[in-house]
Amino acid sequence: MSEARRDSTSSLQRKKPPWLKLDIPSAAPATAEEPSFLQPLRRQVFLRSVSMPAETAHISSPHYELRRPVLQRQTSITQTIRRGAADWFGVSKESDSTQKWQRKSIRHCSQRYGKLKPQVLRELDLPSQDNVSLTSTETPPPLYVGPCQLGMQKIIDPLARGRAFRVADDTAEGLSAPHTPVTPGAASLCSFSSSRSGFHRLPRRRKRESVAKMSFRAAAALMKGRSVRDGTLRRAQRRSFTPASFLEEDTTDFPDELDTSFFAREGILHEELSTYPDEVFESPSEAALKDWEKAPEQADLTGGALDRSELERSHLMLPLERGWRKQKEGAAAQQPKVRLRQEVVSTAGPRRGQRIAVPVRKLFAREKRPYGLGMVGRLTNRTYRKRIDSFVKRQIEDMDDHRPFFTYWLTFVHSLVTILAVCIYGIAPVGFSQHETVDSVLRNRGVYENVKYVQQENFWIGPSSEALIHLGAKFSPCMRQDPQVHSFIRAAREREKHSACCVRNDRSGCVQTSEEECSSTLAVWVKWPVHPSAPELAGHKRQFGSVCHQDPRVCDEPSSEDPHEWPEDITRWPICTKNSAGNHTNHPHMDCVITGRPCCIGTKGRCEITSREYCDFMRGYFHEEATLCSQVHCMDDVCGLLPFLNPEVPDQFYRLWLSLFLHAGILHCLVSICFQMTVLRDLEKLAGWHRIAIIYLLSGVTGNLASAIFLPYRAEVGPAGSQFGILACLFVELFQSWQILARPWRAFFKLLAVVLFLFTFGLLPWIDNFAHISGFISGLFLSFAFLPYISFGKFDLYRKRCQIIVFQVVFLGLLAGLVVLFYVYPVRCEWCEFLTCIPFTDKFCEKYELDAQLH
């Protein structure tokens, strides 16, 4: 046995490089001077090699080190609610949540509002990578080294270069033990002394995979005949957050992944780069990948002896902290690059198509959105100041990007609803004026007449205003009992109360008209009680009537019997569904052929007894079953959607938010989609879908409510108020990051110019400036309450809490005031139409007065 051991030892000595010297110190008992509490710490730190693969080591504590778990008091419901509300509004006392909000805000600001102050840039940017030395890859002396470890040599760990501290110290009685991050191959103490390391520097967090990227990967897997799950298994290790401790997490979650190496074969290198681009080092640059693919195949060095000079030169080909850094051309000519290869145990086979997959990943990858410097900030060249406090800088770095779920859902709904509306209701005449159609139509008098139909043109390439009202547009007469519309309907019913059936002498037909409209020479106006056919009611002849094809004496359903006799007022008569006699009643108003029935025309509840041909030409709603206009409810027909609870009182208040998902046409929808995929999507990445959804919907509802007050007879659709509420978020974000911007006034005036331009654009027809103004004001209040912010000290933190409460109360007051003006004290503004549409011509703007819409 001893002979075999000597043979194996001699074979190992022959394979040992001549320059390699191993000095293994002998084990020595712990000295008396060494503190006893440091022994477990030292065993834990130096239990395994920090440069060679090792199995997961589980340290078993002695029985005297076992401690009872600390008993904690259960958090009360009140404290839980308070803590959750503080975290949601971004004013919690927890440093982690506060830094998370504020770092994301700074990152967003740097992309949107221009250049930052120089001090911010110096504290946000990492140190220069030009001065990288080999000493940064060497392991420093450990925190505590006993006599037995004083002879240990330094071990080179190339991947440890630039690895910053990811967690703070775990202090125990005044001494700290650093947590070594477990890399894909091994761990190294170089992680704690690199020239780029520091407790004050937190790593940039990786952006979550976009929906488009995941969809592209799934489609590629299906085209190749692979399962979608196979492609996602290799990415199960990737996280969208920084774990509290890399050592504890990797040891617990991935116990079988420590038997790997830093270096792999060329076929697996791209897989390693695509699997660990964010947790070990940044994604490789495109130029470096091209150099790697163009490099000639070299001899395989697997299992061979390693030369010291080659080992020291090979670190130049290894990934640095941010991507791959190429060696200078002069140095490359003197020292050829040598790839270091080593055997890797991999459960997955070699993957093909990596030369296409890596550029595709780089195509979909995007940097995080700095607070205050989003898309608009890039367009306006905003930058941070040169110097920013480190506390503010940490707040910027801690902010993560959210997935814009609300933006994608909203865009899908807008597109789908617009397509369905255009397909079902068609496209109105395109233009800015009014479109007139003239035709010869048979009317209720039995003769053809030339009639004209006037329709407002729609330059958005979409349905007409009547169709949009039927779909759910903002329209005050459908949301409340409008005083003018109600008085107009009552006046029409009063005229109908004194009408009677006009029977033509040639027996060509009859129609319900007034005495002025019935010819005394060509027809007979059957008016009760003058006409002998008048029935009796309670022993007296009826004073109002007659009605063509309706009489209480011959109607069976509903019958006019005591105590349910039909009233004296004919406008209160029900619709007769069944008559007891046919056309031979010996009553002239019952035996004639009726030529006109009620037709609801227009959008203001106007009813006219006319022929079906004329009703269809005027795009009205013809009622074949009724004989009087009082028997139909035209506003219910015009508004559509759900029927009113009381047919006389419109109550479709849900139009305030339903109209946010409608558009006036295809162009209108495209404009909204462009806005949502740029500004709204950018802001949702910063604040999350729940905050943006609240601001978007409440701003739109407030804008529509103000528009319904000042422009009650105008059908409006689209998220105009919501979009201006989102624009108000940009102003609030600018105000919150004012102290860190290099030129905040320039960014402010640029934003102001954009808003003024959009407000001027709102002077065109079909664009509501009242919704713009109210949506912007409400969005301003809501943004101060719900958007994330950057705090500049404890006093500023308390000020933000007061600010949240104050602006929520102000918004609720604004909303309550608008509700009172709409339902309780309605107002009428004569000049308000000039604020939303300037009549350059007589027919440029649609008339807002009630009488102008009556045909």
Swiss-Prot record:
Keyword Magnesium: no
InterPro entries hit by this protein: Inactive_Rhomboid, iRhom1_2_N, Peptidase_S54_rhomboid_dom, Rhomboid-like_sf
GO cellular component, one term: endoplasmic reticulum membrane
Residue ranges that the UniProt entry lists as topological domain Lumenal: 433-655, 713-714, 768-772, 825-855
Segments for region (Disordered): 1-35
Ranges of the Cytoplasmic topological domain: 1-411, 677-691, 736-746, 794-803
Alphabetized UniProt keyword annotations: Endoplasmic reticulum, Glycoprotein, Golgi apparatus, Growth factor binding, Membrane, Phosphoprotein, Protein transport, Transmembrane, Transmembrane helix, Transport
Compositional bias ranges of the Low complexity kind: 25-35
PANTHER family: INACTIVE RHOMBOID PROTEIN, INACTIVE RHOMBOID PROTEIN 1
Function in brief: Regulates ADAM17 protease, a sheddase of the epidermal growth factor (EGF) receptor ligands and TNF, thereby plays a role in sleep, cell survival, proliferation, migration and inflammation. Does not exhibit any protease activity on its own.
Assembly and oligomerization: Homodimer, or homooligomer. Interacts with TGFA and HBEGF. Interacts with EGF; may retain EGF in the endoplasmic reticulum and regulates its degradation through the endoplasmic reticulum-associated degradation (ERAD). Interacts (via cytoplasmic N-terminus) with FRMD8/iTAP; this interaction leads to mutual protein stabilization. Interacts with ADAM17/TACE.
Name the record gives this protein: Inactive rhomboid protein 1
